[in-house]
Amino acid sequence: MNLHEYQAKKLFAEYGLPVSEGYACATPQEAAEAADKIGGTTWVVKCQVHAGGRGKAGGVKLAKSKDEIRAFAQNWLGKNLVTYQTDANGQPVTKILVESCTDIAKELYLGAVVDRGSRRVVFMASTEGGVDIEKIAHETPELIHKAAIDPLVGPQAYQARELAFKLGLVGDQIKQFTKIFMGLGQMFLDCDFALLEINPLVITAQGNLHCLDGKINIDANALYRQPKLREMHDPSQDDPREAHAAQWELNYVALDGNIGCMVNGAGLAMGTMDIVNLHGGSPANFLDVGGGATKERVTEAFKIILSDSKVQAVLVNIFGGIVRCDMIAEGIIGAVKEVGVKVPVVVRLEGNNAELGARKLADSGLNIIAATSLTDAAQQVVKAAEAK
């Protein structure tokens, strides 16, 4: 689960990290009033969406009057912001962050992720702040310095000092960096983060460290024990199809292709997408109906897949282990009738009661193409999609 920048900074402040005074505003009037609360003559206004690249897309502005703030809010609130990290539709802007302006002398990078290989939280720091860290990691990896935190021990001050020296910090900056590092490390463990990023962490004109931005992703599997963070979830940022799927305990991820996929089991779903690609097709989604597939869930799965206007054909690939293939066949027949599927549907059934399931599909009188193998299914669905 992602947090907005203003939510991340609120958490930073709770752990004693230096952040700008700011207010998340839902109306142009609130945004203008926030400038009065903050004071000063210059403010930064930022669209709050779960995506990077806001500045280049016009979603961040330096404002020198309340009229500019109000105009920025009027322009963006209720609209979608499209960045290089969003799809063509963009993300809806429901909040504008208005905060005080910071004089920047230098930009640094500080981030942390869970390294599953070492079973540690790995902090990364770089003198190249304010830019895409993936680009730095690819082109100049020597500029990224790391520190691994053992979750049983927690962050250590000596690790912070080592990173501070490598970043070229001096004097009181080392103490400030140590405080930030220790706070972030403890926050990461306390709040079950999967990713944390401050880009940039700046050195101000006065020589102090300041968290100018904040990005947080929380491990969704740990949300049951993070009720406070769970309340921060912003459903407006979710893909509507993914949100619909979650209500039915379906694992759905939208993609860019034109072949809808419905599979039971995540591994089989990934293998299905691979073989569709291998035969020249392009999957429109990842959808795992799981081991408890029922007629109702299959029906909802069809609805979700077909809500994507790009879908030209649907491939259903079911391995009957826990689930009986004849029951799945009944679900497919019922779903096709209820939803009124207009695109070709290719079905491959294998395993428990597969032959009985295939007979039910054949006797249904519906335009369902039965496949004899996974390769045959992929070839048939690619051919059907091209014919559309």
UniProtKB/Swiss-Prot annotation:
Mg(2+) binds at N199, D213. It holds the Pfam family ATP-grasp_2. Residues 9-244 form the ATP-grasp domain. InterPro entries: ATP-grasp, ATP-grasp_succ-CoA_synth-type, ATP_grasp_subdomain_1, Succ-CoA_synthase_bsu_CS, SUCC_ACL_C, Succ_CoA_ligase-like_bsu, Succinyl-CoA_synth-like. Its cofactor is Mg(2+). One of its GO terms (molecular function) is succinate-CoA ligase (ADP-forming) activity. GO terms for cellular component: cytosol; succinate-CoA ligase complex. Its EC number is 6.2.1.5. Pathway: Carbohydrate metabolism; tricarboxylic acid cycle; succinate from succinyl-CoA (ligase route): step 1/1. Keywords: ATP-binding, Ligase, Magnesium, Metal-binding, Nucleotide-binding, Tricarboxylic acid cycle. SUPFAM superfamilies: Glutathione synthetase ATP-binding domain-like, Succinyl-CoA synthetase domains. ATP binds at K46, G53, R54, G55, E99, T102, E107. Binds 1 Mg(2+) ion per subunit. It catalyses: succinate + ATP + CoA = succinyl-CoA + ADP + phosphate; GTP + succinate + CoA = succinyl-CoA + GDP + phosphate. Substrate binds at N264, G321, I322, V323. Belongs to the succinate/malate CoA ligase beta subunit family. Heterotetramer of two alpha and two beta subunits. Succinyl-CoA synthetase functions in the citric acid cycle (TCA), coupling the hydrolysis of succinyl-CoA to the synthesis of either ATP or GTP and thus represents the only step of substrate-level phosphorylation in the TCA. The beta subunit provides nucleotide specificity of the enzyme and binds the substrate succinate, while the binding sites for coenzyme A and phosphate are found in the alpha subunit. This is Succinate--CoA ligase [ADP-forming] subunit beta. It comes from Aeromonas salmonicida (strain A449). The lineage of its organism: Bacteria, Pseudomonadati, Pseudomonadota, Gammaproteobacteria, Aeromonadales.
